[in-house]
Amino acid sequence: MTALLIDGNALSKTLRTQAAQRAAALTARGHQPGLAVVLVGANPASEVYVRNKIKACEDNGFFSQKDAYPDTLSEADLLARIDELNHDPKIHGILVQLPLPAHIDSHKVLEAIAPEKDVDGFHVANAGALMTGKPLFRPCTPYGVMKMFEAHDIPLQGANAVVIGRSNIVGKPMAMLLLEAGATVTICHSKTRDLAAHTRQADIVVAAVGKRNILTADMVKPGATVIDVGMNRDDAGKLCGDVDFAGVKEIAGHITPVPGGVGPMTITMLLINTIEAAERAAAAA
């Protein structure tokens, strides 16, 4: 059995078309959705991510601006800039590209973003609200994964789900969203004693640790849905995920590729969150 491919590019295209329609409707009412992306330093990977986010905005009728600063920028100056963006009516979403230089406290910076403009969903107010099932914004990557389940009619209620990874960005919020959808969730991580014992019981596995081949074919239950959030390079320098794709696709029922799986969905859900922020602001105006 070869797994059905969950195509993140195709689903992203559909969702971005919907986002563009909502953006056009808002713009016609004088409320063009606006995203500010803040980049500190010259991390090449971060520059690519920021460029992709800005392009996605431009392609879909959003206003966007990039604030790029040298890595010598002080924490105080960055916090002052975020405060300005919090009060800028043209800006509905603020995204600070991580990682930040070592001298800047990323927690303090993320907490400085107004919760109603926290389109990454990382502010403690939104992270806490996720626990109660009522967040203003869901973090983009887990939100995108949930849309993939929905698009492919993958049943979550009563399913055994394993999330490999416990980061605040993917692992923990992913577990919360699966729990909210009625799955029985296990979070595995670097201290988990027997990872395979957990994954072999799972109907759904989400791998999000940034480690090649953390999940191999012998660790997967036949017919399981496998979501690969990882972004790594193989020995030849080619992009790959956390899952041994060639082996696992022969066992799983559904699987996401890398590239072309979860990656495109992350930026798409950033657009959706920004639209929702703009719609709330327009309703309150």
From Swiss-Prot:
GO CC terms in record: cytosol
GO molecular function ontology, one term from the record: methenyltetrahydrofolate cyclohydrolase activity
Reactions the enzyme catalyzes: (6R)-5,10-methylene-5,6,7,8-tetrahydrofolate + NADP(+) = (6R)-5,10-methenyltetrahydrofolate + NADPH; (6R)-5,10-methenyltetrahydrofolate + H2O = (6R)-10-formyltetrahydrofolate + H(+)
Domain of life of the organism encoding this protein: Bacteria
Biological or metabolic pathway of the protein: One-carbon metabolism; tetrahydrofolate interconversion
GO biological process assignments: L-histidine biosynthetic process; methionine biosynthetic process; purine nucleotide biosynthetic process; tetrahydrofolate interconversion
Protein residues bound to NADP(+): 165-167, 190
Cross-referenced CDD domains: NAD_bind_m-THF_DH_Cyclohyd (cd01080)
Keywords: Amino-acid biosynthesis, Histidine biosynthesis, Hydrolase, Methionine biosynthesis, Multifunctional enzyme, NADP, One-carbon metabolism, Oxidoreductase, Purine biosynthesis
Family membership: Belongs to the tetrahydrofolate dehydrogenase/cyclohydrolase family.
Quaternary structure (record): Homodimer.
Protein function: Catalyzes the oxidation of 5,10-methylenetetrahydrofolate to 5,10-methenyltetrahydrofolate and then the hydrolysis of 5,10-methenyltetrahydrofolate to 10-formyltetrahydrofolate.
Protein name: Bifunctional protein FolD
Organism listed in the record: Burkholderia ambifaria (strain MC40-6)
